UniProtKB/Swiss-Prot annotation:
Reported cofactor(s): Zn(2+)
Cofactor binding: number and manner: Binds 1 zinc ion per subunit.
Positions annotated to bind Zn(2+): 247, 252, 254, 260
Predominant cellular place of this UniProt entry's protein: cytoplasm
Family listed: Belongs to the TRAFAC class YlqF/YawG GTPase family. RsgA subfamily.
Pfam families the record matches: RsgA_GTPase, RsgA_N
Organism from which the protein derives: Bacillus cereus (strain ATCC 10987 / NRS 248)
Quaternary structure and partners: Monomer. Associates with 30S ribosomal subunit, binds 16S rRNA.
Gene Ontology CC entries for this record: cytoplasm
Keywords from the UniProt entry: Cytoplasm, GTP-binding, Hydrolase, Metal-binding, Nucleotide-binding, Ribosome biogenesis, RNA-binding, rRNA-binding, Zinc
Function: One of several proteins that assist in the late maturation steps of the functional core of the 30S ribosomal subunit. Helps release RbfA from mature subunits. May play a role in the assembly of ribosomal proteins into the subunit. Circularly permuted GTPase that catalyzes slow GTP hydrolysis, GTPase activity is stimulated by the 30S ribosomal subunit.
Compartments in which it is found: Cytoplasm
Protein name: Small ribosomal subunit biogenesis GTPase RsgA
Amino acid sequence: MPEGKIVKALSGFYYVQHEEGITQCRGRGVFRKNKITPLVGDQVVFQADNPSEGYVLEVFDRKNELVRPPIANVDQAILVFSAVEPDFNPGLLDRFLVLIEYHNIKPIICISKMDLVDEKMRETVESYANDYREMGYDVLFTSINTSESIDILKPFLEGCVSVVAGQSGVGKSSMLNVLRPELELKTNDISSHLGRGKHTTRHVELIAIGSGLVADTPGFSSLDFIDIEVEDLTYCFPELKEASQYCKFRGCTHLSEPKCAVKAAVEEGKITEYRYKNYKQFVEEIRERKPRY
């Protein structure tokens, strides 16, 4: 049986990309019975007699799954944050990074609008960028208005399934349109036909850019730590995770415990104070979260 990847799901049809092209498929009735919903990004087994009539027979296990947009098996997230208008926001960036690390997705930090900064702001942003690079993150500088700077991003997309995410007003859609200019019409098309408040569901589609696939809908529209527990949080901060193995107590929360290697690393300047401050804020937020029943 042939295998492929679902690149679009719309009105009960699943569009499966495989070696010979794309086949329009329906899901088997057993999926509904077992409450399995195939998602864009799923690797599947399918059967088809012709390109427009096929059936998805099996959905392979997922390595991760996002709710908004509904997509599975994401390799990386391109996190778009502006240097100015709005100003660079490390607190919000850390929130995105926690969510992405929790879903086992590789983050790539892309700081846009670098063509608009003055010298003082450039120094500030570059200082933050160096901090994040030392933590092990890829950090890129781009200007949405120049295709040359967007070309910096393209090699990172090769062979991967990527989502674009980030704060509002930083040009996520503009970036997608520069990567694939023909998307602009499609974006306008969707927004004119699908109005908010109506009973319509915006579909997500994976679009080919080089040998990579990029979701055409920005990811992580919800920034709440709904599923993350305090004990998970350390593992979403790479530098805290590295230091925590030297804490005296297993399960150390790095707040008030004695002989905490994380707090020692903060005092020694090995972990930045603003990252530790954000960690503590997120712990408090998780602890204040109302329990779900």
